[in-house]
Amino acid sequence: MADNKRIVLAYSGGLDTSVAISYLKERTGKDVVAVSLDVGQGGESLETIKQRALACGAVESYVVDARDEFANEYCMKALKANAMYEGVYPLVSAISRPLISKHLVRAAHQFGADTISHGCTGKGNDQVRFEVSIASIDPTLKAISPIRDLSLTRDVEIAFAKEHKLPITQTEKSPYSIDQNVWGRAIETGFLEDPWNGPTKDCYSYTDDPAFPPVEDEVVIEFKEGVPVKIDGRDVTPLQAIEEMNRRAGAQGVGRIDLIEDRLVGIKSRELYEAPGAVALITAHQELENCCLEREQHRIKRDIDKRWGELVYDAQWFSPATQSLNAFIEDTQKYVSGEIRMVLHGGRAVVTGRRSDSSLYDYKLATYDSGDTFDQKSSNGFIDIYGLPSRVAAARDVKFGNGIEVPENTVE
């Protein structure tokens, strides 16, 4: 049985976490197991990252292609919940942290570790998301951050790498702090911390300039119980649906987001995001729900969706509250099946058509033309009953001299 003197490190392959392998071992005396996940972020292959981790001193390197798992079990939950924190942010980073945490815990159990390390600062949301998620899965594990807890600054990293001759090619530091996956991309940088400064073109990667779009792109997305299953008649998996909509909506500049965001840790921050596939799919899904959900159910779900997004943003993916909301949301999706036609153009995803066998839209009831089956005479009795509380309250107000004053007609 493996000893319990190891640390599992969330390893990205970059300078920070490459240095952290040897730094953690030197500072704590524990061997380090590097854990890397592919959640659709692109870049280097998992094999390249694995070999770099071993070359930097990791005793084991645990790598996982988690793209389908992420799309199926995390992105689709966010889609069904129409998750938009503060009305605009589709939780790009927030939904990946619970998945990464799950694999960190799995690796800790597999390799006999008692501590999990991540690369977060003490100022952001992700430190909370990782550590609360880890504690929710296995509360016996400890969590540390070299940057936050062991004073691992970038200057220390560079000096440490040179001194220990670590196999890391040091390139000019990008001015941007990037976190990306298949659901979207988060961009932070020093000059954007002034909220008056506009983003420059080189901030963006997933989206083209919406001011210069190509010819409009019409797409038909078919959903089954809230999940996209076909695009333009072709079968797709959730991952394929997200990837295709990233390409097509991104080419039209859809999904650029620039906001002042209320962070979990209590500060406001300026955030820049790109999420073309997420924004287009959520727009389509919301419109299908407009067709298929009963009015009161739909009203309640809109409130639940908002709260779900807040809980997940606030590191509560595994909480009992979120699990209960998941059950409600999943139940609402049993009739959310059908097709949505959208036009992607100039930064917008506009729904132009919808059809569903389970739609509650009834043409014969809605039309004002011949064939109308709605009995308009029924409205008289409905209005009498519906307006009764207002009439009773108005009569009381008049009785006590508080009736609504109507100005005299001054027209001569």
Swiss-Prot record:
Species: Bifidobacterium longum (strain DJO10A)
GO cellular component terms given for this protein: cytoplasm
E.C. code: 6.3.4.5
Keywords per UniProt: Amino-acid biosynthesis, Arginine biosynthesis, ATP-binding, Cytoplasm, Ligase, Nucleotide-binding
Record has Lyase as a keyword: no
Primary localization: cytoplasm
Protein name: Argininosuccinate synthase
Gene behind the chain: argG
Residues given in the record as L-aspartate binding sites: 121, 125-126
Record GO terms (molecular function): argininosuccinate synthase activity; ATP binding
Signal peptide positions (record): none
Catalytic reactions on record: L-citrulline + L-aspartate + ATP = 2-(N(omega)-L-arginino)succinate + AMP + diphosphate + H(+)
Membrane-spanning parts: none
